[in-house]
Amino acid sequence: MSVLFTILLMAVIGGFIGAMTNYIAIRMLFRPYKAIYLFNKRLPFTPGLIPKRRDELAEHIGKVVVSHLLTEDAIRARLLDENLQKEITDTITKMFHEKMKLETTPNELLHHFGYENAEIRSMAWIEKTLEKEINHFLSTKKTTKMSDLIPTMLESELTTKLPHVTERITSKMTLFVASEEGKIQIKQMLQKFFEEHGKMGSMARMFINIDSFSEKIQQEGLKLIGQEDTKNLINQLLTTEWKNFEAKELQELIPTEKQAHLAGQLTSELIQTLPHEKLFNQPIQVILRGYEAAITEKVIPFAVERMLDFVATHSAEIVERMDLAKLVETQIATFSLPEIEKLVVEISGRELKMITYLGGILGGFIGIIQGILAMWI
């Protein structure tokens, strides 16, 4: 009986020693957090292994993550994964539909991002920029001929339209001369003509009936306007004036001293044509509602695909600029030692307990062997 008790006692003692040895060894990975000194001498195994090698550990983990986990190829493959693309597209589409149920004006949106008085500030910026650009254009192009400023397509279009302008002028002239107003105007011109020529005019009026004479002039005027030579003359005059206009420099039409005033006027006119009140106060959803289907079916998938493709193409440069190894190292370095210990225990707690138990089992087994050997010796 004493032999069996001795063997069991040795097994219990060996198991306890083995378990405690492993438990202490595991604890010494983290504890103590700081070096302990006795008589100005640092005690061995202080601080613990992980606190002592913390910086080195963080550096190596960062290198391992970049070299074997977050590699350029792995990142590129993930970015080009169709499932990821679909997930991102679905998420953005869902967010877009949620936002479309709201009523958010550009003013409110800009206010949300800290841009106060958006409408006033934006219009002031547009007005200032527009006036500056017009002034710059007038100053830099003042010696340029109008023929060089007018686009070739517009110049050709205007040149081909001159005959139509001639037709319109003669048509308007015919309508006016043939009208009652035109007849009255001709009569008044005749009366004024006779009055301006004194006695000779008065004598002529004695032999001429103004009403019939004005009708005659009206008829002859209509014949003259309708003649092809008249149309050719008008067309020639228009062509000549157009050529003269093209030959002039910009400063001949707009003198330097009037440029600033003209720029201000043009800017004011252009600003007034902008529907800025509607633009800044109409809900964005109202503007986009007609394009909602196109945005969800085409724009969002295309934008996501292009974005992921761009990031994948430049993944090497992005990873290099981000310096992921340094990022991981820095993040690990920010963890406190209790946090690192807690993290490791949460991940490997079961395995660490098994190591402790294994130490107890091995210690107990060794104790049994020692007990048996002690009986034999």
Curated annotation (Swiss-Prot):
It is found in: Cell membrane. Pfam families: DUF445. Its main location: membrane. The chain crosses the membrane at residues 1-21, 357-377. One of its GO terms (cellular component) is plasma membrane. Keywords: Cell membrane, Membrane, Transmembrane, Transmembrane helix. It is a multi-pass membrane protein. InterPro entries: DUF445, UCP032178. It comes from the Bacteria. Belongs to the UPF0754 family. PANTHER family: UPF0754 MEMBRANE PROTEIN YHEB. This is UPF0754 membrane protein lmo2224.
